[in-house]
Regions:
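Gly/Gly-Pro- and Ser/Thr-rich, intrinsically disordered tail segments characteristic of DNA damage-repair
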Residues: 2-5, 9, 13-323, 479, ...
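DNA-contacting surface of Y-family translesion DNA polymerases
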Residues: 39, 260, 270-458
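Generic "edge-of-domain/loop-turn" microfeature
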Residues: 70, 184, 218, 341, ...
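A glycine-rich phosphate-binding loop feature that marks nucleotide/adenosyl-phosphate handling sites
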Residues: 213-219, 313-314, 372-384, 458-470, ...
């Protein structure tokens, strides 16, 4: 579907499904006072930290952050810009980096004198100047606690300029800032103020950044993610891009792919393309189509329901959410969760051990935060080898996937790489009352595991959730179950839980463990030394 965007005037009112007239974003944005938002993204943050700590230039050094002690399938957490310039993506798997560098060096060898390398270097400038050098790169082991410390220092720099209520920490390396009230104070343009902050971060930490400036949060994110790629960097590698609604429509209504845009994943893009919508311009034009036309907003609402409104707003470059809205937001429901991707396919019994370990930790997290839950959810993803007709290795030995009438005949889905894989198992169970009892929660989770997980399939991903969590001290009026555990037993269990937490806080998470943590395939001890699934 292709439109020529020589637009008729946007209607003042548009009819939404349900019959009511909708002034929606049109009225909202007409009444909103213009604001100035800044988005700042620290450039290849983890990799830059590792370069700075080694006394190397992050913009001129080939380095990846990855745990090489795992298999080469491990994901690289960061890749330096100089290595990305060879076409290596920022979240490649380590084996993809190895393969890409191998291809690069094959080409370089052809240009080398005598087609032989006389040495190697991870310095980008040296490699450009001397074709006889082999391209090398540094593999840095992740240090998540250190990255968090550096991120905290950089946040402290932001606080020199802005109040906490005007800063939204989006991730460890990215923030949104409402700078509207500060431009007059500092007597600087948005661009100059942004540059001043980034230069201060660079001076104190050695880390540079990319930034986007726009009148709303969505556009400043797009300016940072997309527009900044098309402008030249300064001598420090800094790119600061600006967008408004008109320039966004002019530059990005024909941009493809849709997945480049914030909040548009592969699933959403696929559903849009199935409807004949390939660009943000297509979506915007569809949203103002007349009811009798093939493309109108009903098409979007039938596909996405209420979420179509967000998609339409973003297609036009609108975003009604403000920094104040973010700070005031309180979720209507809360949950606590733990997930992990296993290093190898796990058979049923070993996968059950993993779920037991994770449930044990989930309960301790509840106790530590003073929370209780009355609903548990378990999601289990199977390994791709279950859909293969060949022997495959699982923890503890080999398993031959059966062929013929006894082979796996259940529903099949596809993974990120398009490989067939059995449909994941997913289920929930309700507890008789809100609780943080290890015994009650673990028993319920084990029963759920037995109910939903196929015993003849190997497992690769596990996700456990405590849903409907509330503060324990808010339950004074809750009716208790007549068959609940005696108060004395509950008191002893709580004392044990609190003792375990106290020991771990003082001496580390591995200071006190359970017997199951030493069984073959257990992962708790290793995970206790990680942050976010990576080495602390």
């Amino acid at each position: 579907m292709w439109f020529s965007y020589k637009y008729k005037q946007i209607p003042e009112r548009n009819t939404r499904p349900g019959g009511d007239y909708y002034s929606g974003s049109l009225a909202i944005f007409a009444s909103v006072k213009p604001r100035t938002y800044i988005a700042i993204d620290l450039k290849s943050f983890y990799a830059s930290v590792e370069c700075v700590d080694r006394g190397l230039d992050p913009l001129n050094t080939h380095l990846v952050v990855a745990d090489a002690s795992r298999t080469q399938k491990t994901i690289c957490l960061a890749v330096t810009p100089s290595l990305k310039s060879y076409g290596i993506p920022g979240r490649a798997r380590l084996f993809e980096v190895v393969q890409a560098v191998g291809r690069i060096n094959t080409e370089r060898r052809r240009s080398a004198p005598g087609r032989r390398f006389r040495g190697g270097s991870s310095d980008h400038a040296a490699l450009l100047a001397d074709p006889s050098l082999e391209l090398q790169y540094i593999v840095a082991t992740p240090r998540m606690a250190h990255y968090m410390e550096i991120s905290g220092r950089i946040y402290g720099i932001y606080l020199r300029y802005f109040a906490p209520e005007d800063i939204h920490v989006y991730s460890i390396d990215e923030v949104f800032i409402d700078a509207t009230a500060y431009l007059g104070t500092y007597k600087l343009s948005p661009h100059d103020l942004t540059r001043k902050i980034i230069q201060e971060v660079l001076r104190e930490t050695g880390i540079t950044a990319t930034a986007g400036i726009a009148p709303n949060l969505y556009l400043c994110k797009i300016a940072m993610d997309l527009e900044a790629k098309h402008i030249p960097a300064d001598k420090d590698g800094v790119r600061i891009a600006e967008l408004d609604e008109q320039s966004y429509r002019r530059k990005y209504w024909t941009h493809r792919p849709l997945t480049d845009f914030w909040r548009v994943g592969h699933g959403i893009a696929a559903r849009l393309e199935a409807a004949g919508l390939y660009t943000m311009g297509d979506i915007a034009r569809c949203s103002v189509g007349q009811p009798w036309e093939r493309y109108n907003e009903d098409v979007l609402y039938k596909i996405f329901g209420v979420n179509a409104e967000l998609l339409i707003d973003h297609a036009w470059g609108w975003e009604p959410c403000t920094m104040a809205d973010i700070k005031a937001y309180r979720p209507s429901a809360n949950s606590l969760s733990i997930g992990q991707v296993l290093s190898a396919p796990y058979p049923y019994d070993k996968a059950k051990l993993i779920v037991r370990e994770m449930t044990d930790q989930l309960v301790l997290d509840l106790v530590d935060k003073g929370l209780v839950t009355d609903q548990l959810t378990l999601s289990v993803g199977y390994d791709t080898s279950n859909a293969a007709e060949a022997p495959h290795e699982v923890l503890g030995g080999y398993r031959r996937t059966k062929t013929g009438p006894d082979s796996y005949q259940g529903p099949i889905s596809t993974d990120w790489y398009g490989r067939p894989v059995p449909k994941p198992a997913h289920g929930s169970t309700n507890l008789p009352r809100p609780t943080s009892s290890t015994r009650l929660v673990t028993d319920a989770m084990m029963e759920l595991f037995d109910r939903i997980v196929a015993p003849d399939l190997s497992v690769r991903r596990v996700y456990v959730v405590a849903a409907h969590v509330v503060r324990e001290d808010s339950l004074d009026g809750v009716q208790l179950d007549l068959f609940e555990e005696p108060a004395e037993d509950a008191s002893r269990e709580r004392s044990r839980q609190e003792a375990i937490l106290a020991i771990r806080r003082k001496f580390g998470k591995n200071a006190i463990l359970k017997g199951m943590n030493f069984d073959e395939g257990a992962t708790a001890r290793e995970r206790n030394e990680q942050i976010g699934g990576h080495k602390a």
